[in-house]
Amino acid sequence: MKKLVLLRHGESQWNRENRFTGWVDVDLSEKGREEARTAGQLLKDEGFVFDLAYTSVLKRAIRTLWTVLDEMNLMWIPVTKNWRLNERHYGALQGLNKAETAQRHGDEQVLIWRRSYDTPPPALTESDEFWPGKDPRYASLSSQELPATECLKDTVARFLPYWHETIAPQIRDGKNVIITAHGNSLRALVKYLDNISDEDIVGLNIPTGIPLVYELDDDLKPLKSYYLGDQEELKKKVEVVVKQGKA
């Protein structure tokens, strides 16, 4: 049996302000830093040890991973950062308050933008301050790779090749891996691992800062999955995510 740990970054400043974040490089809130410390201590107490770590190129995920590894005395292990693990790109919604957007467009429309599989939000323009082509960390990406907006289907399409080509072979070789990423990039992976339908994925919400453990067979098919920690706290955090897009 092989184990994989998935961790959504701790609460960010824009999570706290209930704003669409996407590829905007927002840092953790103080609560988010504490969530990361708690996650690291929990993993350490449960006896987890990692050989490799993967994360996005966004600081809220990177800082969460740093903090977790620091708590576990594992800051020395190899860490790979890749844009394919980024949050889904929220297009022209980035920076907008979710509740205010729901008041303007309706709860149902915002739910579709946030959680549907194949409906992207309105696209960003190249003149927008958040256009990723202006960011040096994406200088190596082609114009076809740079998103102006994404739905979850797009996020799956960019993440899964990296999973198959880079991460999965390490797990098959017996490496203990943690992936610290984002709500939607992790939803993309969970959809694949658990074979969740395009319709049912709408109901999947991943809370901030709580380790999700997968026990996998030799073919990397899930035997079971579970969140570590207090289950009542888990329910509260999931409910927070659910309510974010409502007016």
UniProtKB/Swiss-Prot annotation:
Task: State its Enzyme Commission number(s).
Answer: 5.4.2.11
What is the reaction catalyzed?
(2R)-2-phosphoglycerate = (2R)-3-phosphoglycerate
UniProt-listed SMART domains: PGAM
Question: Pfam family example for this protein?
Answer: His_Phos_1
Which parts of the sequence are marked as the site Transition state stabilizer?
H182
Record carries keyword Isomerase: yes
Q: Does the keyword Transcription apply?
A: no
Q: Which GO terms describe its biological process?
A: gluconeogenesis; glycolytic process
A single Gene Ontology MF term assigned here is:
phosphoglycerate mutase activity
Pathway participation: Carbohydrate degradation; glycolysis; pyruvate from D-glyceraldehyde 3-phosphate: step 3/5
Q: Which residues bind substrate?
A: 8-15, 21-22, 60, 87-90, 98, 114-115, 183-184
Q: Which UniProt keyword terms apply here? A: Gluconeogenesis, Glycolysis, Isomerase
Its biological purpose: Catalyzes the interconversion of 2-phosphoglycerate and 3-phosphoglycerate.
PANTHER family in alphabetical order: PHOSPHOGLYCERATE MUTASE
Q: Which family does it belong to?
A: Belongs to the phosphoglycerate mutase family. BPG-dependent PGAM subfamily.
Return the protein name: 2,3-bisphosphoglycerate-dependent phosphoglycerate mutase
The gene that this protein is the product of is: gpmA
